[in-house]
Amino acid sequence: MINLDTIIYNVLDSIAPTYQGYPLNWNELPVISYVCEQNSSAIKAAEEITDYIVYKIDLFCNIEDDDIGMCEDINRLMNNLGFTRQQCVTLQEEGGVHIVFRYYMYIDKNNRTYSKIYRY
């Protein structure tokens, strides 16, 4: 099992204050939260060869914040790590904007990433 939480935290925290799970401080926006929704074996022989990993990222910001710029930053940095964006949904909430992303990747034990796995 490959754990990318520290890497994800460091990347997202370069954009805005970041929390694993729900933000602790809702008074200062923008803020990012993330959670690993899935980390499972995609290909397995005698040992685990490739993992399938899905991260959900939430961006909470005020209406006047540059949410488009932060979304572009999140997308660029996650793509640089080898993730593929599966979903991006913008929700208008009272006094702000909530943007939900889902990113996935296949990663092997040598840290090579893939957007698809072909099974023969």
Model-based region annotation:
Residues A16-G21, N80-V89:
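Short secondary-structure junctions
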Residues D58-T84:
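Mid-chain, well-packed structural core segment of small domains
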Residues Y34-V35, M78, F83, Y103:
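Aromatic-residue hotspot detector
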Residues G21, G69, G82, G95-G96:
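Residue-identity detector for glycine
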Residues M1-D5, W26, E37-Y52, Q86-Y120:
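Short, charged interaction patches at domain edges and termini
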Residues I53-I57:
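A short beta-strand signature
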Residues M1-K44, N62, M70:
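Small/polar-rich, solvent-exposed N-terminal microdomains that initiate assembly or binding
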